[in-house]
């Protein structure tokens, strides 16, 4: 899980979603997991 100021899709399978006011990226590739913070 990477914590970043700006979350971006890193590949085609990445999805940007918002959970409880936190912007997250979920992906099949574990290295692409991110959240904003």
Swiss-Prot record:
GO molecular function, one term: structural constituent of ribosome
Biological process terms in GO annotation: translation
InterPro entries: Ribosomal_bL36, Ribosomal_bL36_sp
SUPFAM superfamilies xrefs: Ribosomal protein L36
Keyword Zinc: no
Pfam families noted in UniProt: Ribosomal_L36 (PF00444)
CC terms in the record's Gene Ontology section: cytoplasm; ribonucleoprotein complex; ribosome
Coiled coil regions, renumbered to chain: none
UniProt keywords, alphabetically: Ribonucleoprotein, Ribosomal protein
HAMAP family the record matches: Ribosomal_bL36 (MF_00251)
Similarity remark: Belongs to the bacterial ribosomal protein bL36 family.
Protein name: Large ribosomal subunit protein bL36
